[in-house]
């Protein structure tokens, strides 16, 4: 309750800064290259990353350096397996737009692993926590209906409070809101079988970001992919 009051109290002071930021900020597109591939040798495992700009690879340099490709590279090494990977993403996607627009794009073939990246745009679009919880729950249920035996991994909401691009007021406001949304996500995941939360609790130094000051660079994508791959590998069969 206190965090919610603080967020809505601070936010009006950040709105002018946000408008100026929207006008002047660097904007990168999706990373070039194929959004699917196969890597490694051994037992074949299919992996689909679905979600926002982290799936699209903004700041990654190449599409195979983004969330799906980075996770696949590490997972192939850890499990000594052949990973067939695909990225289904949209810049600016929220939990609701992923559910309504991206899930219908999935192949009808069931997959072994889903990696989900949502939350950033739910925070910045000022979604209410109740809507966030409902949309996220429905997204997980939809993925489970698509692939009943899949492991579903959600990448945690990142630490807005240290994003170099954001002015201090927005760092504070979105930082608090992001933590709240991440707690809600954890609570939902605890009630679901076969769903894993991988926190983004890295130290967000400026050198961890791409030139836009908002998205990861290729090295950080690799670190996130490693964390996701280790979580998948550690899950009991």
Which role fits each region the language model picked out?
Residues 25, 90-94, 173-174:
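Short, flexible loop segments at the rims of nucleotide/cofactor-binding pockets, characterized by
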Residues 19, 54, 92-94, 159, ...:
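Residue-level detector of flexible, active-site-proximal loop/helix-junction positions
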Residues 1-48, 61, 229, 233-237:
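N-terminal secretory targeting modules
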Residues 46-48, 54-135:
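Conserved SGNH/GDSL esterase-like catalytic core that processes O-acyl groups on lipids
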């Amino acid at each position: 309750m206190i965090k919610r009051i603080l967020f809505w109290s601070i936010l009006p002071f950040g709105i002018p800064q946000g408008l100026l930021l929207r006008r002047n900020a660097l904007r990168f597109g999706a990373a070039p290259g194929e959004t699917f591939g196969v890597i490694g040798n051994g037992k074949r495992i299919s992996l689909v990353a679905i979600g926002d700009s982290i799936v699209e690879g903004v700041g990654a340099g190449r599409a195979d350096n983004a969330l799906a490709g980075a996770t696949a590279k590490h997972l192939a090494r850890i499990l000594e397996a052949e990973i067939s990977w695909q990225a289904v993403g949209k810049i600016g996607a929220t939990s609701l737009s992923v559910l309504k627009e991206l899930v219908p794009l999935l192949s009808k073939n069931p997959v072994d692993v889903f990696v989900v990246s949502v939350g950033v745009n739910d925070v910045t679009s000022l979604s209410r926590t109740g809507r966030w919880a409902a949309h996220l729950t429905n997204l997980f249920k939809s993925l489970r209906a698509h692939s009943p035996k899949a492991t579903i991994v959600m990448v945690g909401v990142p630490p807005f409070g240290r994003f170099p691009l954001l002015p201090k007021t927005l760092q504070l406001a979105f930082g608090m809101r992001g933590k709240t949304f991440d707690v809600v996500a954890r609570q939902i995941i605890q009630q679901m079988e076969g769903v894993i939360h991988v926190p983004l609790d890295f130290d967000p130094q400026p050198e961890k970001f791409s030139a836009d000051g908002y998205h990861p660079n290729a090295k950080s994508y690799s670190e996130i992919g490693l964390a996701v791959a280790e979580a998948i590998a550690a899950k009991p069969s």
